[in-house]
Structure formats: C-alpha cells, structure tokens
C-alpha cells in the first residue's frame, strides 16, 4: 500500500506544472494564515475580528499587498501581528525564490541549445545555481531587513521615546513589511505621523525600492560590480524603466498635490519634496503612505493607477504587470511607429514570442482590473475613480487605499481577495504557462492582413 501511495503521489506531482505548484503553495499559506488569525489568541483585547477580516488579512499578507479591512495595530494582538509578519516574510521570500526557481524548472523543459542561448543572452539562473539562488536571496533579505530595522529601532527609541522592546518590534515589523513591499503598518495612520521625519521615511522607501527592483537584478549588479557592459537585457530594461518612472511619480505628486491642503499643501518645501519622493516609490509596489491618500486629487489617483498597474521588477516582491513587460510593449510600439521590421533594444532583438507574451499579460491584466471595477462601481455607492484605485491596488498588490476597503460589501471584499491572489501569482504562472505551452506545427496557414486602425 505505501508503494502504491508513493507512486500515486509521484504521478500527481508529475502532472502538475511549476505554476500549479506555486498556486497550491500560496493557497495553503493563505488557509493556514486565516486559521491562525481566526484563533481567539490572535485578537486584541476587546476585539473580535470576523472570519472575513482574517481571510482578507491573511491573503493581503501572503500576497504582500497591504490592503486591510481592520486596523492591524488595534484589531490583532501581539500574536496576531506576529502571524501577519510571518505571512509577509513567507509570502515575500517565497515569491522571490519560487519565481526564480520557476526559471530553473522551466529550463528543464527546453533543449540544451536553447538553455545555453538564454543563459548567454540574459545571464539567467541555471540548474546548477539553485543553491546560489537560495543563498543569494537569503543574504539580500537579511542584509536589507536587518539594516533597515536597526535604523528604525534606534530612531523610535531616541526620538519617539519608545521602550526598547516596542521599538525593536516596530523596527523589525516595518522593515520586513518594507522590503517585502507589503505596506502593513502598526500605526492607525500608517506612516502619516512620520511624514516630516527623513530618518523613518528614507530607510523604508529605500528598502521598498530595493525589494521592488527584483532579485535577479540585485544579484547581477553584485556579480558585475556595477559594470553596465556586463548587464543583461533584463537588468538594463528594469533599471531604465525605474529611472524613468521614479521621476514621473515624483512629478505627479509635485504637480498634483503641491498646493493641496489635504496632502502636501501644509508642509514646508523640504517636507513636500520628501513626501513626493516617498510617494513616487510607494505606488510602484508598496502600500505605505505618509499623506492621506483619500485627500489626493482625482488626477493624482489616475496617475497612481498607472504606476501601480505597471509595478516593479520581475522575480522580486513587486506587483503589477512588471517593468520588463511594459518596456517590451513600449519598444514594440516605437519600432512599429518607426517602421522597423524588428524590435531592437540595446542591440538585442526581442523575439515575437516575447512580444506576444507581454501583450497577453498586459491585456489580461487590464481585463482583470476593468471587469471587477465595473461590477463594484455598479453595486456600491462609491465613485468610479475610488473603486478603480482600490481594484488596481489589489491587482497590483500595492496596498494603497482611498479608505473604502473596510466599507465595501463582503462579496466586494471577496473580489479584492481574488484580485490580490491573481495579481500576485498571475504574471508568474501565466508567463510560465505561455513558455511551456508553445506548440510547434509541421505546417503554417497562409498569411493574411486585416485592416488595423
């Protein structure tokens, strides 16, 4: 009987692709987290969070989103907050390692020639580098989180007079939340109380930025010793789009909120510039906020929607459709406008298959955002721009909110739960599925050209 059981499990595992294993793993983490948060010991004294609150919080933590329906600082006990922290770390670290290992598993399904070509052109991870991947991810995670936690702990103790234990806990929690791009905070106003403190805002923002760039880029920068000539196309595209979108987000905040008394208007010039920088980084991937998002102008909301949807680097803790996906689409459009037969970036030609994959991910992402936004807007009393902001934030696993999440109906919140799960795992599993399911035909149909535009 044991032999039959082992063989059965082996057959079942053999029929599961790497994408399916990732989905099952994260679903199991959500279930475990929901059960733990549903225990009485997880609730703060005098608080009785509902099962929906436990499910929503667990999903948001595992998917490193940051959207909540109850205040993390008051609804959960120390044990409950510890569960949230553990789910964030497992979700963030697991996403980084599993997304990278998917490339390793994927390479087994490709021929040797293809693997060698891919390794030479992208310096991607090979089958013999699994140990190096795990050690590299662990080292980067530990260094960034410990450094950020140390700075925050010292600041909380010396300036805000928090006892050592409380300061250490707050420093560690927010450090993990920042690097994993979760955006969970242990203060009712998130980080608004620290809006004028660069010693809190800057370390957290830098941790978010490092985590959102993506682990493959970080490892390659370390290996190449910051020599651009050795960078792969993936690294170049990620850094290029980061260098473009950060100033764009900064200008969005400066132009849209400089005189808004509900956000930047009441601050001095230094405070305005600091918070514009913070909110240039956060919409890309994390849900921390140092100003009241609900008080932003609708135009700023719309621009933030775009930044959230694009997201951050691949194989990291960021959400969205990813920087490289957006970059491939931009260069494809530019090549078409110029009349170039090929899409060429940094003296490298982007294959038609990659272009199709990028288009599929982007269009499916648009569909995943538009459909729920229409449904929730039609069945709730909130405006379309508010609902769109929440939906994009959930899909892109950002966590910024206009403050309506807790007031939505339960089935609306369940839609957001599904969006968070889809947004976190969708780009990874979809990309893998598209690569694994490429079919080869022994014949080709005649070519035709319908009228476009």
Regions found by a protein language model. Give the residues of each.
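Membrane-proximal intracellular helices of multi-pass ion channels
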Residues: 1-453
């Amino acid at each position: 009987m044991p032999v039959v059981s082992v063989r059965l499990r082996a057959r079942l595992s053999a029929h599961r692709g790497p994408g399916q294993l990732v989905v099952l793993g994260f679903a199991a983490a959500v279930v475990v987290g929901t059960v733990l948060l549903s225990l009485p010991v997880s609730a703060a004294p005098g608080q009785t969070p509902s099962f929906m609150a436990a499910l929503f919080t667990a999903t948001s933590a595992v998917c490193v989103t940051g959207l909540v329906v109850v205040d993390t600082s008051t609804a959960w006990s120390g044990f409950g907050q510890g569960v949230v922290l553990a789910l964030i770390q497992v979700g963030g670290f697991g996403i980084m390692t599993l997304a990278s290992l998917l490339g390793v598993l994927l390479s087994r399904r490709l021929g040797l020639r293809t693997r060698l070509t891919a390794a030479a052109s992208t310096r991607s991870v090979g089958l013999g580098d699994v140990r190096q991947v795990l050690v590299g991810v662990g080292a980067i995670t530990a260094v960034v989180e410990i450094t950020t936690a140390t700075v925050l702990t010292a600041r909380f103790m010396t300036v805000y007079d928090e006892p050592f234990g409380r300061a250490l806990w707050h420093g560690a929690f927010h450090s993990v939340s920042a690097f994993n791009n979760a955006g969970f905070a242990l203060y009712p106003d998130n980080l608004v109380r620290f809006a004028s403190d660069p010693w809190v805002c800057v370390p957290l923002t830098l941790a978010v930025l490092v985590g959102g760039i993506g682990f493959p880029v970080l490892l390659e920068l370390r290996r190449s010793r910051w020599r651009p000539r050795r960078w792969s196309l993936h690294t170049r595209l990620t850094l290029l789009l980061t260098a473009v979108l950060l100033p764009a987000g900064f200008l969005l905040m400066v132009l849209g909120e400089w005189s808004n008394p509900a956000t930047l208007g009441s601050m001095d010039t230094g405070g305005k510039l600091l918070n514009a920088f913070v909110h240039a980084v956060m919409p890309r991937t994390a849900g921390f906020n140092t100003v009241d998002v609900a008080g932003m102008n609708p135009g700023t909301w719309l621009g933030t929607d775009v930044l959230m949807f694009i997201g951050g680097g691949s194989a990291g803790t960021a959400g969205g459709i990813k920087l490289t996906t957006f970059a491939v689409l931009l260069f494809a459009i530019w090549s078409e406008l110029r009349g170039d037969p090929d899409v060429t970036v940094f003296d490298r030609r982007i294959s038609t298959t990659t272009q199709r994959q990028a288009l599929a991910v982007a269009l499916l992402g648009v569909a995943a955002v538009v459909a729920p936004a229409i449904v929730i807007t039609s069945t709730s009393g909130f405006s379309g721009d508010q609902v769109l902001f929440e939906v994009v934030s959930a899909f892109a696993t950002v966590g910024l909110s206009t403050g309506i999440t807790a007031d939505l109906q339960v089935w609306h919140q369940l839609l957001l739960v599904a969006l968070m799960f889809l947004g976190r795992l969708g780009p990874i599993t979809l990309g893998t599925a598209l690569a694994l399911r490429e079919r080869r035909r022994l014949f080709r149909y005649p070519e035709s050209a319908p009228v476009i535009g």
